[in-house]
């Protein structure tokens, strides 16, 4: 399937598609700890801030349909963390386990290295075994777990921290 996939920088025209992907996971999983859907203006502002801060938003498309996206932001908003980022990656729920995530992450790694990023952090709900295994396959290591740090769907949630040195 990877022959049909195009990986490129997101444009403003992709925002609604990215929004649909994110909002699906907000509504249907603990992959994202938000309770309420993101509105398009919030994502447009995030997109514009990413451009201003030279932080990528990368999309995967098949036949001009956005099937996944990946991005990163500085891990903490303090100068001492300027070489550390936390990433997000989501694939459309009908397009998981098809190699799209790996293509997105490979491009994200290239972007991070080009921006002199030293390390990338993944914060993953401990019940999301597929994402944990995916990150292991990419070379991330498990560095810890935050116990009962989140709360969603009437339950406390643990978050795994994973890291890769680039």
Stretches with model-predicted labels:
Residues 20-37, 50:
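Helix-loop element at the rim of GNAT/NAT acetyltransferase active sites that forms part
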Residues 89-94, 98, 110, 126-127:
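Active-site acidic-Proline motif in GNAT/NAT acetyltransferases
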Residues 97-110, 133-137:
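Conserved acetyl-CoA-binding loop-helix of GNAT-fold acetyltransferases
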Residues 112-124:
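Conserved GNAT acetyl-CoA-binding A-motif
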